[in-house]
């Protein structure tokens, strides 16, 4: 079987990819304030293809894709249309999931929400400020 080679951004070159049995991947997810677009699909199709290739080679994959469910764009859009920001984020995330399912994309292993990490984020900011 031919060796998989990937671009290493730290080294700025294509290098042989020599994963263990389990391959972990992270991709920045959506900020769900409006409809999914082709740019979202293009990014996630690339990760989906890589994940499928790794699985075909016998690796277990764990792809984590976050959802930034609170930020200025969500707050502004929610105010603009008169809904609570969490309701907007939930509705747009559900539409995104439907779109990804329609494309036949593999589901993420985990999809942490930014709102679930606010206490940790505040703690990190406090450490930086101290």
Where is each model-derived feature located?
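N-terminal Rossmann-like or analogous alpha/beta NTP/dinucleotide-binding catalytic cores
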Residues: 1-130
């Amino acid at each position: 079987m031919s060796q998989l080679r990937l671009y290493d951004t730290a080294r700025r070159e294509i290098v042989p990819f020599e994963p263990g049995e389990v391959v972990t991947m992270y991709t920045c997810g959506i900020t769900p304030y409006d409809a999914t677009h082709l740019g979202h699909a293009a990014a996630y199709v690339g990760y989906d293809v890589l994940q499928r290739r790794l699985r075909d080679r016998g690796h277990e994959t764990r792809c984590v894709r976050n959802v930034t469910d609170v930020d200025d764009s969500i707050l502004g859009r929610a105010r603009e249309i008169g809904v609570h920001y969490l309701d907007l984020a939930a509705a747009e995330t559900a539409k995104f999931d439907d779109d990804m399912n329609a494309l036949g994309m593999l589901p993420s292993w985990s999809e942490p929400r930014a709102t679930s990490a606010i206490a940790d984020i505040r703690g990190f900011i406090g450490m930086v400020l101290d």
